[in-house]
Regions:
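Acidic, metal-coordinating catalytic segment for phosphate/diphosphate chemistry
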Residues: 1-26, 31
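Conserved hydrophobic "DFG−1" position in protein kinase catalytic cores
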Residues: 28, 36, 108-109
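Structural motif
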Residues: 33-34, 43
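Nudix hydrolase/Nudix homology domain
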Residues: 44, 115-176
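Unchanged
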Residues: 51-79, 84-145
Length: 176
């Protein structure tokens, strides 16, 4: 899988311990709108999340999209797009003093028409996470506005840059 982007804050010492997280995220279009997760502040992100030990990328993608959105991925539609790599000093207290190194693997896929219940974590519920559908341009504008208003939070910058890469891919004739 091709690396699409490296976001390296370079705010850490090279000799620090490293916490590596593998995430898998889905790029799903429904009637020309992108399937996203939106919080109560209006921030949007691709559905997906951390890979459990022993899980394949496909298994993680299927599980995470079902949990986040209630939709079921059609397995034979899964197509790799690339990955985003992030490195920065970990800001979570239980990993403080470590390098946070995340690799987000991105896949295009399709979902079935029927939608079930979401299975959000308590933290996701507290943030008011819900399923949303926006055009790609609307999603880019929402995250650009968040960057302008809130500043460059790590995941928001990742999501914004990812959406721009998806747009560039589609405009250059790539499959969505």
């Amino acid at each position: 899988m091709e690396r699409l982007l490296l976001l390296d804050a370079k705010d850490y010492d090279e000799d620090m311990d490293e916490f590596v997280r593998i995430a898998v995220r889905g790029i799903v279009f429904i009637s020309n709108r992108l399937l996203l997760i939106e919080d109560n502040k209006g921030e949007v992100k691709l559905p997906g999340g951390g890979q459990d030990e022993g899980e394949s990328d496909s298994d993680t993608l299927i599980r995470e999209i079902r949990e986040d959105t209630g939709y079921s991925v059609i397995p034979d539609t899964i197509r790799p797009f690339g990955y985003i790599e992030e490195k920065r000093r970990d800001f979570k207290s239980y990993h403080e003093g470590r390098i946070f190194h995340q690799i987000s693997r991105l896949y295009f896929c399709e979902v079935s028409d029927e939608r079930g219940e979401t299975q959000l974590s308590e933290q996701e519920k507290q943030y008011g996470m819900r399923t949303a559908l926006y055009t790609l341009d609307e999603a880019i504008a929402k995250n650009r506005a968040m960057l302008d208003n809130v500043g460059e939070l790590a995941w928001n910058q990742r999501e914004y840059r990812t959406l721009l890469l998806i747009k560039e891919h589609i405009e250059n004739g790539g499959v969505s």
